[in-house]
Amino acid sequence: MSDHEVKMVVLSTENLDESIKFYETLGFSLKFRDGAHFAALDGGAVTLALATPVDHPIPGKVVVGIKTADVDAAAKEIEATGGAIIKGPYDDAHERRAVVYDNTGNGLVFYSPLKR
């Protein structure tokens, strides 16, 4: 079994309220909202996240969020296998993150909750 688990898909939006309303009409309920720039919707096993450019890892792109125990090691692994680190690894308010491109340019964000 992999140490990495796909847990989130991040979509870009310029208007968080309109996007939340759109996805709620499809039956996705709001799990979490951070101001006017980020929302997490219940997509079952995978969270559907909506983010404005303020909080989006790669604005304008679809990004897959992968939960992992070791963000730093995952980022190094990406670099070693032909991908590229875009940002990080770094700590934000809630988690450790690394924003990367895979070997074909797809956006990924590896993350792990910070231990408090």
Swiss-Prot record:
Signal peptide: none annotated. Keywords: Isopeptide bond, Ubl conjugation. There is a cross-link at K76 (Isoglutamyl lysine isopeptide (Lys-Gln) (interchain with Q-Cter in protein Pup)). PROSITE patterns: VOC. Transmembrane segments: none annotated. InterPro entries: Glyas_Bleomycin-R_OHBP_Dase, Glyas_Fos-R_dOase_dom, VOC. Residues 5-113 form the VOC domain. This is Uncharacterized protein MSMEG_6630.
